Amino acid sequence: MSLAFNVGVTPFSGQRVGSRKEKFPVQGFPVTTPNRSRLIVNCSLTTIDFMAKMKENFKREDDKFPTTTTLRSEDIPSNLCIIDTLQRLGVDQFFQYEINTILDNTFRLWQEKHKVIYGNVTTHAMAFRLLRVKGYEVSSEELAPYGNQEAVSQQTNDLPMIIELYRAANERIYEEERSLEKILAWTTIFLNKQVQDNSIPDKKLHKLVEFYLRNYKGITIRLGARRNLELYDMTYYQALKSTNRFSNLCNEDFLVFAKQDFDIHEAQNQKGLQQLQRWYADCRLDTLNFGRDVVIIANYLASLIIGDHAFDYVRLAFAKTSVLVTIMDDFFDCHGSSQECDKIIELVKEWKENPDAEYGSEELEILFMALYNTVNELAERARVEQGRSVKEFLVKLWVEILSAFKIELDTWSNGTQQSFDEYISSSWLSNGSRLTGLLTMQFVGVKLSDEMLMSEECTDLARHVCMVGRLLNDVCSSEREREENIAGKSYSILLATEKDGRKVSEDEAIAEINEMVEYHWRKVLQIVYKKESILPRRCKDVFLEMAKGTFYAYGINDELTSPQQSKEDMKSFVF
């Protein structure tokens, strides 16, 4: 296959992005220039060309790749590498049938404890991670021999192997998985030392290790794809014994395909930002003189969390809802009076374009009408998607979160004494993840029954994701207050210092809360990775990516209040 590149400078047209089933038109790898033009790279590679070539690499010459395909065991390591590459570059969705077939065969070999899996540390760790994430029952005890560095060093220590052990250990879903805890502990120390000592000669590999160590749980699919496009190097897998299935696939094949896919996503993202800004102005939200301006960061987080470019409307719905939740939170938290907050809740419960009573202020009218019109629009779109009305359900979710905001306001205003456990049991409802996640699920191509939406599984998944967000936000706020020398502590931190009638330091309280974050994160993974489930995996993945987005937003710094890392990342999202 030839790759013919034609380079020219063309203004970004903003035209509709074509289907991935079409031959790629002139797709841009945009490079910022003073006149705001973009460098366009025209490639003759087609989606079908590359996918056909990839699918050929997944099978033997005499295979038709039927459902019952049994692959040669010696092919598994290289096929796992291909799967990992496709996932890292964010294009695995185009090869799910082939990936599932390979993982079925890998699981069979895992159960047999076949030497092709168990005879190589890197293959063993990668197989564990890929199988667990897909919901296969694999015991972490099989990785117990790698629980200390000395044991691994005797098997020829190399950096990619340790990275794979680190990634596998991050898939710990049960408290009792001590072997993964041990692996994560020593690999983290080892990799940190390698970075600090500047001991990694390969610059790309050095940056990859830095990226993983900075905030591993906060790596969404799209964020990971962007970084791996920059740092991609097939020699990363050279330690694996393979049948050279990559021989007729050069790095450019992978990169051109993945960059074209990413470029489609980013073109849609830019269009989505324009639509979001127009909506924000049309709702007159730009005239309000309080609260955080989160339009850009909300659009960016939506693009990180909703990665499939077929879901451009879903990203817009997600971003609009995130903006509204933030504005309402700010209104209840620091601007509106208790009476005004009660009024907003009454208006939402009534849900009329022309309410029976007066608004009382222009701000209340702007807030309610923005919410009213937006929810009605989203509900109508969801009705088409679901084949039934979900407006009442969405309005109830808004009443729920606004009522939770009011309870928190009253608790603070009235000086109500609350224990840490009381706070934890109710505070998750004031986190926007449940509302935003349940709304987003309406648009991902799955018909949702009341049984599914009201199920214990759905409630638990939303609750655990919300708790991750609530607790991370509180810890982040506490750290910011400490750095800025602001009096007072984040509420949960304050309560945690006096938990169970004992007095502990703020640092001890934060450590305990971080342990709680890990607990709820593991619960999220348990529910998402479980195969026997009332919710389809596509729906659960919405909440999984939201949880990752929460780690991204609050894992290091409060990116909604004072964006730092996100600003740098947004710049880097332009090739």
Curated annotation (Swiss-Prot):
Domain notes: The Asp-Asp-Xaa-Xaa-Asp/Glu (DDXXD/E) motif is important for the catalytic activity, presumably through binding to Mg(2+).
Protein name, UniProt field: Sclareol synthase, chloroplastic
Key words, A-Z: Chloroplast, Lyase, Magnesium, Metal-binding, Plastid, Transit peptide
Coiled coil: none
GO MF annotation list: magnesium ion binding; terpene synthase activity
Annotated localization: Plastid, Chloroplast
Pfam families: Terpene_synth, Terpene_synth_C
Residues that coordinate or bind Mg(2+) 1: D329, D333
Designated gene of the protein: SCS
Gene Ontology BP terms: diterpenoid biosynthetic process; gibberellin biosynthetic process
Family: Belongs to the terpene synthase family.
